[in-house]
Amino acid sequence: MGRIIRVTGPLVVADGMKGAKMYEVVRVGEIGLIGEIIRLEGDKAVIQVYEETAGIRPGEPVEGTGSSLSVELGPGLLTAMYDGIQRPLEVLRQLSGDFIARGLTAPALPRDKKWHFTPKVKVGDKVVGGDVLGVVPETSIIEHKILVPPWVEGEIVEIAEEGDYTVEEVIAKVKKPDGTIEELKMYHRWPVRVKRPYKQKLPPEVPLITGQRTIDTFFSQAKGGTAAIPGPFGSGKTVTQHQLAKWSDAQVVVYIGCGERGNEMTDVLEEFPKLKDPKTGKPLMERTVLIANTSNMPVAAREASIYTGITIAEYFRDQGYDVALMADSTSRWAEALREISGRLEEMPGEEGYPAYLASKIAEFYERAGRVITLGSDERVGSVSVIGAVSPPGGDFSEPVVQNTLRVVKVFWALDADLARRRHFPAINWLRSYSLYIDAIQDWWHKNVDPEWRKMRDTAMALLQKEAELQEIVRIVGPDALPDREKAILIVTRMLREDYLQQDAFDEVDTYCPPKKQVTMMRVILNFYEKTMQAVDRGVPVDEIAKLPVREKIGRMKFEPDVEKVRALIDETNQQFEELFKKYGA
């Protein structure tokens, strides 16, 4: 038990804290605000408080809880909405109304709800950390596997029969090698700053299919990969992340709204229950965990929300699921680090950010990955992290963007000009990159199309050629270009408008399956080959531009039937044959 001696914003200094540990959770003041010790000097402790500290004064008590900041992991996580320190917002609303009272806590998982438990082990079985004790159908999409906590191993001496239990009831007893008995419930706690263990890390060879053509074809994200979406305000970071949360082929989505506007979380809450998962036909909310830590919530909790989210994601990974984690936005978290570092009077680094910004960002992204999980069976799970970065004024040379680019392998650079032109997703194809292309091309060749890489590279080269030609057009106008280059501009316009641009509000075009993506690409590249042949045979470029098939190619993105899209190849060939006859080529 200590006493407060100083309060500066979210930081509180207390003395008489002998015996306290780093990162221990404490209750601050008479109201009992939740805080975490971030520095110890002698018997003084510096505490960052996760709630508003107005009204707290020196002399009030500080009480240690003996545990570090931990999350509860068990059935009840999915469809829930938490704040940055895993307090269920729905429950807090029932306790204190629309405005959250300070010092309030509620258990993260519902204590009175009964879950139907089916055991998967029997008495006498040997178990190790990560083994599946039983399963609970948490939602109609996700079967929640109840795991043996990583620190437990031994022999099952008692296991609950199939039936309905609450998370507080003991469902198994394990006799450890030293003879002690460990009682296991459906949930366990895990400190958020410690990454959950696994057996082995696997290379990221499987793409995370998002249904967004720009991303899947040109700048692919791998399962277990890391990606950053930097962009100025209004360029579509949040909308892009919502699209990925909706349609990516991860089985579980953890969405962290970290320091962004509250109405963006409201959008998720309103849209996701109405939207259907394309694979199961069930509401998307049933596979989603939301962590809302909006811009008007206390600054210190932003850091906690990032760690809370990734720990929950690792827990579902350990069950053998592919998890996608969206962090929107990591810049706000970095700003919180800057504010707390300033109040700690630490030496500032670049632009006032703390010198350890790079290592903090790296520490977060390193928890992504595709792994073989703990346990006797060889389960494979993954956590793919997609972090939005909001640099002030869209300046990509800013420290948060630069330090993020050092650790992530995929960079989707959003462009305000494209966003203004209503080009969605506004990912600039000349500035973005993905370092996973070589690793995942085998998957595409085996499962979708053996020519995927060749087509992708051809299209990319065309788009880069277009950028060079645009420079010339700006100076001397399009009429000065030779026919061959005019023809390239026709094809690249088709690539931009009919392939890269996507309609997030159209039922068909919001999600484009891999087979359709490859077929659309083939249609456009076939048009390109025929165009080049026509130009070489002396057909005027204006005639090519007027071909009726061009309009059909422009509409193919709204066509759900892949065979009808494929039929455009024959139609293109036929119309070019007629042109060749007309011009005697």
Swiss-Prot record:
Its main location: membrane. It comes from the Archaea. ATP binds at G231, P232, F233, G234, S235, G236, K237, T238. It comes from Thermococcus kodakarensis (strain ATCC BAA-918 / JCM 12380 / KOD1). Signal peptide: none annotated. It is an enzyme of class 7 (translocase). It catalyses: ATP + H2O + 4 H(+)(in) = ADP + phosphate + 5 H(+)(out). Produces ATP from ADP in the presence of a proton gradient across the membrane. The archaeal alpha chain is a catalytic subunit. It holds the Pfam family ATP-synt_ab. CDD domains: ATP-synt_V_A-type_alpha_C (cd18111), ATP-synt_V_A-type_alpha_N (cd18119), V_A-ATPase_A (cd01134). One of its GO terms (molecular function) is proton-transporting ATPase activity, rotational mechanism. Keywords: ATP synthesis, ATP-binding, Cell membrane, Hydrogen ion transport, Ion transport, Membrane, Nucleotide-binding, Translocase, Transport. InterPro entries: AAA+_ATPase, ATP-synt_VA_C, ATP-synth_a_Xtn, ATP_synth_asu-like_sf, ATP_synth_asu_arc, ATPase_a/bsu_AS, ATPase_F1/V1/A1_a/bsu_N, ATPase_F1/V1/A1_a/bsu_N_sf. It is a peripheral membrane protein. Has multiple subunits with at least A(3), B(3), C, D, E, F, H, I and proteolipid K(x). GO terms for biological process: proton motive force-driven plasma membrane ATP synthesis; proton transmembrane transport. One of its GO terms (cellular component) is plasma membrane. It is found in: Cell membrane. Belongs to the ATPase alpha/beta chains family. This is A-type ATP synthase subunit A. Its EC number is 7.1.2.2.
